[in-house]
From Swiss-Prot:
It is found in: Periplasm. The keyword Signal applies. This is Probable ABC transporter binding protein NosD. Keywords: Periplasm, Signal. Required for the assembly of the copper chromophores of nitrous oxide reductase. Could be part of the ABC transporter complex NosDFY. It comes from Pseudomonas aeruginosa.
Length: 109
């Protein structure tokens, strides 16, 4: 026999808070970038979950199979610097709330 109980309010609040923590923006430097020259970086293949901010000039190239995304809310990449180029990246599961300015790539510079 399976019994269902109501989720206590404190657990619901903790779950909501955990979701907002997971959606926090991280510096692009938290990814395993490989140097390819001055201000040139390669993101190797893999799945990278979260929102990442680029706050300095750089050329970011993603290897085949490199995917990033914020798991359904927010923007995958937030660009806050000039002289930034992004090439070959697959951006998945970014938010759909245009009022919150969600986008695959949000250019704030």
């Amino acid at each position: 026999m399976i019994r269902y109980t109501k989720l206590p309010a404190t657990c619901a609040v903790l779950l909501l808070a955990a979701g907002s923590v997971m959606a926090q923006v991280q510096p692009i430097s938290t990814l395993p970038l490989q140097a390819q020259g001055e201000n040139r970086w390669l993101l190797p293949a893999g799945e990278y979950h979260g929102q990442f901010v680029i706050d300095q000039p750089m050329q970011l190239r993603c290897a085949a199979g490199a995917c990033c995304g914020p798991t359904g809310q927010g923007s995958a990449l937030i660009i806050e610097a000039s002289d930034v180029s992004v090439e070959g990246c697959t951006l998945l599961n970014w938010g759909r709330d245009l009022t919150a300015m969600d986008a695959g790539v949000h250019i704030a510079a």
